[in-house]
């Protein structure tokens, strides 16, 4: 969908398309005395569930089953046990609580069921990335985010539908970045033609790991940014969106130096003067203002 568009997607997933054929063969192999007795399928998006597995009625969707909330990722107890082991063998430079305090805001707070709010999970890939740097070098990595876990912006470009008005989905990302959370519902399946609808866009952000379940509000699920790693990703998506739509552009190296000067030396005025001058120069961006 993101790379080659709807027509190619439909050829794969409808009629005699390869993807649908593959799932039909799985069903055939698991029926009666077929060779497949058990299967566990991961990475199946809600779009796949609707468009490909409509006849695949031999399985159960466990995505939001609280019994499987901890199947992938590390609980805090598991992270502490791991750190305690390295501390006992003199490989951990800091104290366990100190290291947890560094990792938690960046890697924790994933929840996949409203009944598992007491059991937030750490992203295991990011925890191992951190330890792979921290243990041998005895210091926190300069970059807390592993580039391998970044969701490809091109996967969202198709859904944001960038144009001169930016589209509603880009506004949803902007609102989520501003407030840190949004109200939504989670569906296990919806068709590709409904993919770009605002409600489904929120659901897809959840399935991409960019939102997580924080609780309930007004009878709906409260979806929130889980940690600083994801917040940084969403900021970068907004920057890419503005650049791609040619609505607003900034010289990022210059802005970075101005922000650093504000942070370390208290020179706040040049930052806002730069913003003001660019807003004036790029006067066609009323949506941004």
Locations of the language-model features?
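Substrate-engagement module of ASCE P-loop NTPases
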Residues: 11-37
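Phosphate/oxyanion-binding active-site loops and adjacent basic polyanion-contact surfaces
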Residues: 11-19, 75, 201, 289
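Short glycine-/polar-rich loops that comprise or flank the Walker A/P-loop
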Residues: 35-38, 59-62, 66
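Extended alpha-helical interface modules used as scaffolds for assembling large macromolecular complexes
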Residues: 59, 121-289
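Flexible loop/turn segments at secondary-structure boundaries
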Residues: 2-4, 32, 46-52, 213, ...
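Amphipathic alpha-helical segments of the small helical/lid subdomains adjacent to P-loop NTPase cores
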Residues: 46-54, 62-132, 175
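Conserved P-loop NTPase "ATPase switch" module shared by AAA+ and STAND
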Residues: 1-12
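Beta-sheet entry/capping signal
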Residues: 36-41, 45-48, 104, 118-119, ...
């Amino acid at each position: 969908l993101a790379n080659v568009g709807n027509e190619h997607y439909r050829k794969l997933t409808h009629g005699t398309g390869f993807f649908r054929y593959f799932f039909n063969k799985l069903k055939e192999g698991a029926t009666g005395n077929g060779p497949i007795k058990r299967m566990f399928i991961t990475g199946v998006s809600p779009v796949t569930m609707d468009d490909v597995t409509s006849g695949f009625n031999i399985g159960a969707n466990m995505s939001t089953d609280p019994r499987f909330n901890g199947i992938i990722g590390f609980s805090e107890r598991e992270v502490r046990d791991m750190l305690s082991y390295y501390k006992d063998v003199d490989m951990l430079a800091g104290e366990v609580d100190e290291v947890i305090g560094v990792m938690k805001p960046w890697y924790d707070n994933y929840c996949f069921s409203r009944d598992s709010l007491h059991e937030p999970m750490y992203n295991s890939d990011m925890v191992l990335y951190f330890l792979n740097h921290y243990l041998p070098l005895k210091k926190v990595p300069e970059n807390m985010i592993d580039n391998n876990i970044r969701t490809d912006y091109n996967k969202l470009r198709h859904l944001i539908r960038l144009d001169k008005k930016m589209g509603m989905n880009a506004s949803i990302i902007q609102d989520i970045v501003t407030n840190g959370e949004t109200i939504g519902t989670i569906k296990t399946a919806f068709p590709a033609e409904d993919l770009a609808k605002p409600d489904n866009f929120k659901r897809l952000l959840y399935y991409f790991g960019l939102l997580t379940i924080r609780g309930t509000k007004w009878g709906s699920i409260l979806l929130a940014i889980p940690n600083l790693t994801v917040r940084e990703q969403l900021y970068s998506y907004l920057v890419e969106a503005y650049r791609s739509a040619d609505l607003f552009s900034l010289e990022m190296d210059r802005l970075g130096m101005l922000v650093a000067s504000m942070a370390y030396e208290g020179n706040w005025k040049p930052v806002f003067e730069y913003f003001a001058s660019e807003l004036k120069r790029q006067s066609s961006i009323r949506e941004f203002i």
